[in-house]
């Protein structure tokens, strides 16, 4: 069980950065970072980004220096590497989620890509207006964001069609909606009750700003606090506060 760090060589925000990883567990990595005074906001899903001025202190605290390529190799070998695309950030990772078969993982990934991964199976619509979000009733008496499953067809066109359908049913005419991010299930050994493709299936969230009176059917508007009370335990929920905390990253307007 070792903490590894590569040389500060990655430019961002006017300085150079190193990557800090564990080859055994995220718990070990978080514990080391906390002891060293590295804030949790520096965690990027499978590593910490640390500024160059902290490099020497982290090595002195026990992190072992290694070249960048070797660090990536060790992270891959540990099984802790979380794949993501450019302009994506891992918000949360569940290494053994109780709602999935044993040996699975669920990652919540914020994205600035134009479209979700090809293995997307469900789209959800984050329709928002004046700090409120639109929700619809679920069969169990709760509420959810409006959603559509893609069915047998997948890929970009199927995502567009599902997004068109969910908008038509809830907010009227379809319009531009921006990808906020997605939850990715990684299930190497699905059991007979697992309903989604394996080994990977993605559940995407798209955002669209609408007028406050843009509501069809049985949807209702909830404030962000009310929505958090009802939906805060849903696996995709971290994408919602991430969206509202960085609204300039998303282009769609009413």
Q: Which role does the model predict for each range below?
A:
Residues 41-47, 148-151:
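A short, exposed loop/beta-hairpin motif centered on an aromatic-Gly-Thr core
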Residues 45-84:
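Short, compact, well-ordered microdomains
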Residues 72, 80-123:
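Acidic, metal-coordinating catalytic segment for phosphate/diphosphate chemistry
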